[in-house]
Amino acid sequence: MSNFAVSLPEVIAVLPAAGIGSRMLVDCPKQYLTVGGKTIIEHAIFSLLHHPRIQRVIVVIHPQDTQFSRLSVAQDPRISTVYGGDQRANSVMAGLQLAGQAEWVLVHDAARPCLHLDDLSRLLSITECSQVGGILAAPVRDTMKRAEPGIQAIAHTVDRQDLWHALTPQLFPLELLKLCLSRALREGVAVTDEASALEHCGYHPILVTGRSDNIKVTRPEDLALAEFYLTQRQSLNNDSL
């Protein structure tokens, strides 16, 4: 039997949480709404910190945010905070500046409270076989329609065979993500997720199949769905004890 262990690359997580979540129609940013006994952002952070390969989580907050520092998780020594910008890409870049010499960086939405540990493990395993990185994603199951420009009328059906829903976390080499985000921002490219910045630079990140219950809370009805998933998971955990 081997007497040495393989050393896996260090991974730092960045959690952009500087948005206001206007579609939720509530007074506070959506990441501070409570679901399953904790705020959404706490669920997101704990899902990362429970994995042994995540060394640190950098939370990117709005400059006027007064709520994060009140959470108990904010006192965890593995948590750092930095102020974000007016776009997601600017906020992620701010987080990357605190990542130090980490080889890999993992970016996760603060509004995704239902990440499974096994999905995270599968994504992290690509550091052993990829130099570009990858994302959690779910194959599209529904029939997809493209609308006529500017109106809610069907133009045609889109072939779903090669379509995937992009999820988070998304995992990339730190320096590569910095390079691609910087170029995308400089060239005015709309960056809706980190993978799109790499795509703009000609890279093809891996699609790692993730669970479809890893939802992003963006609308009021998503809260009840997240509550259901988290309660169901807790019930399964209790049954296994």
UniProtKB/Swiss-Prot annotation:
**For site (Positions MEP for the nucleophilic attack), what residue positions does UniProt give?**
160, 216
- Select a single GO molecular function from the record's annotations and give it: 2-C-methyl-D-erythritol 4-phosphate cytidylyltransferase activity
Q: Which chain regions cross the lipid bilayer? A: none
Under which main EC class is this enzyme filed?
Answer: transferase
- So what EC number does this one have? 2.7.7.60
Subunit structure as annotated in this protein's UniProt entry: Homodimer.
Q: What does this protein do?
A: Catalyzes the formation of 4-diphosphocytidyl-2-C-methyl-D-erythritol from CTP and 2-C-methyl-D-erythritol 4-phosphate (MEP).
Record-given protein name: 2-C-methyl-D-erythritol 4-phosphate cytidylyltransferase
Q: Supply the source organism for this entry.
A: Yersinia pestis
Query: Lineage of the native species?
Result: Bacteria, Pseudomonadati, Pseudomonadota, Gammaproteobacteria, Enterobacterales
Tell me the name of the encoding gene.
ispD
